[in-house]
A protein has these predicted regions:
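A surface-exposed beta-strand-loop module
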Residues: 448-479
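C-terminal beta-rich recognition modules with glycine/proline-rich loops and embedded aromatic residues
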Residues: 313-328, 332-419, 469-549
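Solvent-exposed loop and edge beta-strand segments that line ligand/cofactor-binding
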Residues: 33-50, 88-107, 148-184, 221-250, ...
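Well-ordered alpha-helical scaffold segments within catalytic/enzyme domains
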Residues: 2-3, 50-65, 106-124, 174, ...
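Low-complexity, Ser/Thr/Pro/Gly-enriched N-terminal "stalk/linker" regions
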Residues: 1-51, 55-91, 130-134, 144-148, ...
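Beta-strand-rich binding/interaction modules
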Residues: 434-452
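Catalytic-core region of carbohydrate-active enzymes that cleave or remodel glycosidic bonds
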Residues: 248-268, 283-331
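Hydrophobic core segments within long, regular secondary-structure runs in both alpha-
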Residues: 13-17, 53, 57, 67-81, ...
Length: 549
């Protein structure tokens, strides 16, 4: 079973509209070639540039729109690198700066994605491959041996951080960040570079040294006391995505087991009532869409590798109530308050903290929204299809999402009212061999409540009705209290209120009117995922009650 490739997916409908808004935002002035290399990045060299390159590359593929400035940004990158081929300072005496490593991890991710996107252009792809090799060789390999010394004692990690982290002090050879644990974000960028270099670069010595560094990082990542030192959840989850990429390469069961362990820790100790995140473990001060997107991607990837229903359910809930609820009217992504957190004021309310984290989260939205389209359908292998009564060319519907998909050589269009309503249409657009295509619908507690089923067709369309049921649930996580949350299917419904909490509505008194639900006295409950349709002023002023005692 595998996710579809990016070039097999074309977003349509609302997810395409959201992606287009973000695309326009990321082609604005501060993300253009004349500006991007000179903006203030608060000590994160390579971060702004890398996240932007990654976002534009992913959005180009998911929307089918050619990016206006992406190629020029990549072409001009070398003008802003030092003589060793990476950005900003060259440290001496074996010193390492964890924010420099973290920022360059995003630069590696962006360049790896761009290489694959432009791999049929030999001039561009070879230049980028050379840049990837230089960054690995001249920056990251200098960190070999240092991860054993990474400061992980509570008394060493006492920095207070803001929504953009900063370098605090030096301990040993490490310049440490208020974003505790960000030295492990490179598990993501370096694992991507390792897989790419193994396939496309004939440099065995470099890849062996890189593998040794990755092994060192993984070994010490296993030892981090995440709660004791309040590790940043974005750093934690990004590192776990890198660890999972390595698992996909070497199939080491210890890696998969550890990712599942840490993801459970995150759900229990680092997740808000609306499936967003605490920026750090143990510090429910604000959310960060970077981490929310990480958690969505991890949930879907863990479902792919384990097929455990829990991960499918979390994929839905994080997507609709965490990722999509964090997008802003301008297409970017911003931070919110931590709903449900024990001991915090107004824990029942979802409210804006920072309207837009334009320096990081808006760019992370590019891979996030592209992954929403890509992860919706899972293509089964021939062997997996044979194990299920021989249904041919099976594609599993993890969640229905508007788009045009190429699966098993068949071009398929999906039209979905879900999750607002239950009607989903699957239409075959092109099927050159007239082969049967099989749709598999897994059982979902508040989606497809029927038994799992297979539907095969060669042409025409299949219409599926998915249950979208009103119900109450207790907030997930160990720190979100016992309050009740109102759901329609997997979407959280909220009520715009002042600071004063309202009473829980009578479920029998709620009726759906279009995209909202109302009580007989006119009280409105709307999906929090639709916040991006509001005005910027409303986003910053409104408080939305989502928890009821």
């Amino acid at each position: 079973m595998r996710f579809l490739s990016y070039d097999s997916v074309l977003a349509r409908g609302e997810i395409a509209a959201r992606a287009s808004l973000l695309y326009a935002r990321l082609e604005g002035t501060m993300y253009r070639p004349d500006t991007i290399f000179t903006v203030e990045t608060a000590g994160w060299p390579g971060d702004w540039e890398g996240r932007t390159i990654l976002a534009l590359t992913m959005l180009a593929q998911s929307t089918g729109k050619e990016p206006a400035y992406l190629d020029e940004i990549v072409e001009r990158l070398g003008d802003y690198c030092n003589e060793k081929g990476y950005m900003r300072q060259i440290l001496s005496d074996g010193d390492v700066d964890e924010q420099q490593l973290s920022g360059h991890s995003w630069l590696l991710r962006g360049l790896c994605a761009y290489f694959l996107f432009r791999r049929n252009d030999p001039v561009r792809s070879e230049t980028v491959l050379g840049r990837i090799r230089e960054i690995v060789q001249n920056l990251f390999l200098n960190a070999a041996g240092r991860y054993a010394e990474y400061p992980i004692l509570p008394e060493e990690r006492v920095e207070d951080g803001k929504e953009s982290g900063h370098i605090g002090r030096k301990i040993g050879h490490w310049y440490i960040s208020s974003d505790t644990g960000c030295a492990y974000i490179p598990l993501d960028g370096l694992s991507h570079a390792y897989v790419l270099l193994k396939e496309y670069a004939a440099d065995r010595e470099l890849t062996e040294k890189l593998k040794a560094l990755l092994d060192e990082m993984v070994m010490h990542f296993y030892t981090i006391p995440f709660l004791d030192i309040k590790v940043q959840t974005h750093a934690t989850l990004t590192a776990c995505r890198g660890l999972l990429r390595l698992y996909e390469y070497d199939r080491d069961p210890k890696k998969l087991a550890f990712v599942q362990k840490i993801f459970k820790l995150y759900v229990d100790e680092g997740m808000t009532a609306n499936y967003a995140n605490y920026n750090w473990f143990g510090r429910p001060e604000w959310t960060e869409p970077c981490a929310i997107i990480d958690s969505f991607m991890l949930a879907a990837q863990l479902y792919l590798h384990t097929h455990k229903p829990l991960y499918a359910e979390l994929t839905h809930k994080i997507l609709y109530n965490g990722v999509l609820a964090s997008q802003r009217p301008n297409g970017g992504f911003g931070t919110d308050t931590c709903t449900g957190a024990d001991g915090t004021a107004a824990a029942e309310f979802l409210a804006c903290s920072c309207y837009e984290a334009y320096w990081c989260c808006s760019m992370r939205g590019g891979e996030g929204l592209a992954s929403v389209s890509r992860y919706s359908l899972l293509e089964w292998s021939a062997e997996e299809s044979r194990r299920t009564d021989g249904y041919p060319n099976t594609v599993e519907v993890l969640y229905p999402m508007d788009g045009i998909y190429t699966v098993h050589g068949v071009k398929l269009m999906v039209r979905a009212d879900y999750p607002m309503e239950g009607k989903v249409t699957f239409r075959i657009l092109e099927n050159p061999g007239n082969k049967p295509l099989t749709l598999y619908f897994p059982k979902m507690q508040y989606g497809n409540k029927q038994e799992p089923c297979f539907v095969s067709f060669c042409s025409g369309e299949v219409v599926r009705d998915v249950d979208v049921e009103l119900h109450l649930e207790t907030a997930a996580g160990k720190n979100n209290g016992s309050g009740k949350i109102l759901y329609a299917g997997y979407q959280i419904l909220g009520h715009i209120a002042d600071d004063k909490s309202t009473d829980l509505p009578d479920m029998n008194d709620l009726q759906q009117y279009g995209k909202v639900w109302k009580t007989s006295d006119g009280t409105v409950f709307a999906p929090i995922s639709a916040r991006y349709l509001d005005t910027p002023e409303a986003i910053q002023q409104k408080k939305i009650q989502i928890l009821w005692k």
